[in-house]
Amino acid sequence: MNDMTLYLIIALVPLAGSLIAGLFGNKIGRAGAHTVTILGVAVSAVLSAYVLWGFIDGSRAKFDENVYTWLTMGGLDFSVGFLVDTMTAMMMVVVTGVSLMVHIYTIGYMHDEKVGYQRFFSYISLFTFSMLMLIMSNNFIQLFFGWEAVGLVSYLLIGFYFKRPSATFANLKAFLINRVGDFGFLLGIGLVLAYFGGSLRYQDVFAYLPNVQNATIQLFPGVEWSLITVTCLLLFVGAMGKSAQFPLHVWLPDSMEGPTPISALIHAATMVTAGLFMVSRMSPIYEMSSTALSVIMVIGAITALFMGFLGVIQNDIKRVVAYSTLSQLGYMTVALGASAYSVAMFHVMTHAFFKALLFLAAGSAIIGMHHDQDMRHMGNLKKYMPVTWLTMLIGNLSLIGTPFFSGFYSKDSIIEAAKYSTLPGSGFAYFAVLASVFVTAFYAFRQYFMVFHGEEKWRSLPEHHSDGHGEEHHGLGKNDNPHESPLVVTLPLILLAVPSVIIGYIAIEPMLYGDFFKDVIFVNADAHPTIHIMKEEFHGALAMVSHSLHSPVLYLAIAGVLSAWLLYVKLPHLPAKIAQTFRPIYVLFENKYYLDALYFNVFAKGTRALGTFFWKVGDTAIIDNGIVNGSAKLVGAIAAQVRKAQTGFIYTYAAAMVFGVLVLLGMTFWGLFR
């Protein structure tokens, strides 16, 4: 099997499974739908691992070829092709590996769904195909199609329960916010096509960069901007939407309206990292603009800290993990801004495993609670759900950066990258990610203690009903006990827990201090020496652990855990008093900094008001009443006046004829004698 065939199989097998489950779901049934999609993703996962191993042992070389030319227009060729290198191979394993776990988990989670079971499996396999096409693309046009495809499938999955108004509102919100980002992304691609040699293939664009290094573009009369900087910022606007960076982050928490498995696959491990992957892939361009890198770093720092604050007050178990995702995406963006692209991609990988684990463990707890998602109704689930308890503990320990867990190596590396960066804004970024360590540890273990320790709070509640999942699910009754989830749910948790512990230790040497990303990621060491300083300071996993003992990071994390234990185990009455004491801050957090209100009342209503104005003035007054109906009224008015000449008397008509003859004679003589 040649390389082209291998990569086509990896990309297309999930698509085939999606089409079979979607088009023939009623004929093959529920078992047939999940079997064919799981087999398809499993084939892709195994072959992706084979490809990655080939790069690790040195038997596989970088692949960059076109499959076919899709469109030729005006001397421009738009092709479909594959670029497979170490970064692509790593992402292929992450996407297909997490997707396989989610497919298996979904069998148990969606077991009670009466309708839409086959449709759901079709969607998640279609998403896997779309994400693979995005990361394997070798040109901007294919990247954009993959970019839009994952957005479309995300829209379909967030609104999976389309009879629920909150779900349809959430998927529309996600769709519109991402269109804002995609508009900037498309403008950036347009600049690449117009000024970077007339090609959209990555290798051609990178080769042309020296020709536009000092080029400027006039956005406003008399104001010259660096072409590279403008292009970088516009491309990053797309990343802000897709990777949920402030202020385009508002769609992600609401995306929790979709079933839990897609939260793990799309909104934690894969789609939301697409923007980060794109920036890393474009490192040769971004390295030419320190201004763009500073902007990226500051936006990432704002997202990391201020989204973490919002996670502190959430009571929905899934929304805690959602805001955790936002904060961690901010961490990765800080690394990109510090030119530590390899560190960002390292955290993309480790985060994919432990965050997917946290989402799926949250879903398991929801199953045990009969689909009640409110943590205030839980407590002491450790007694009833030991596997879920242990795996969520592992996920949270990795999230907060506990030494020897995967998240420790990547997260601490990001903090060190911000520390060593010399770009404007790096001081604020370092403070933000450092403060976020405490915040992350606090909200992660607040969730953990509320769910798995303390009193069994559902026993003191009136009989309640929750619409947290499906259409007809109820929470636990007073005398009911939670139950551990079936093996089809807990097995993916166990399998994800393993890389959440060990993958960081295994991968840190080659990915950060070795040649794993050689010739894939470009860093201008003279202008942005961060990663090179880190290579001199640290020499692997054990060096990072040793350093942590002398760093404030570890002690901030411990302080966060102890604070959560004190407030939610020892003194559970205290959080309500603190919230009342700091009521203005609590209200600010509760209203998510009023950004939703701003977007709805200013932009959404403003757009509707502007549209109403143009409709009333332009469409109704000018076009309808003026041009269309107005012309008819004018003809009618003229006809009414002409009609008065129709008297019915012969002498009137004779006089008109004489008058006409005189006019004609006058015109004739005027022409002859003038």
UniProtKB/Swiss-Prot annotation:
Alphabetically ordered keywords of this record: Cell membrane, Membrane, NAD, Quinone, Translocase, Transmembrane, Transmembrane helix, Ubiquinone
One GO biological process term: ATP synthesis coupled electron transport
Coarse class of the protein's main subcellular location: membrane
Transmembrane feature ranges: 4-24, 36-56, 67-87, 90-110, 115-135, 140-160, 180-200, 219-239, 259-279, 293-313, 348-368, 385-405, 425-445, 488-508, 549-569, 653-673
Keyword Kinase: no
Cleavable signal peptide: none
Catalytic activity: a quinone + NADH + 5 H(+)(in) = a quinol + NAD(+) + 4 H(+)(out)
InterPro entries: NADHpl_OxRdtase_5_subgr, ND/Mrp_TM, NU5C-like, Proton_antipo_N
Localisation per UniProt entry: Cell membrane
MF-aspect GO terms: NADH dehydrogenase (ubiquinone) activity; quinone binding
GO cellular component: plasma membrane
Protein's membrane topology: Multi-pass membrane protein
Enzyme Commission number(s) from the entry: 7.1.1.-
Protein family per UniProt: Belongs to the complex I subunit 5 family.
Function: NDH-1 shuttles electrons from NADH, via FMN and iron-sulfur (Fe-S) centers, to quinones in the respiratory chain. The immediate electron acceptor for the enzyme in this species is believed to be ubiquinone. Couples the redox reaction to proton translocation (for every two electrons transferred, four hydrogen ions are translocated across the cytoplasmic membrane), and thus conserves the redox energy in a proton gradient.
Protein name as annotated: NADH-quinone oxidoreductase subunit L
Lineage of the species this protein comes from: Bacteria, Pseudomonadati, Pseudomonadota, Betaproteobacteria, Neisseriales
Gene: nuoL
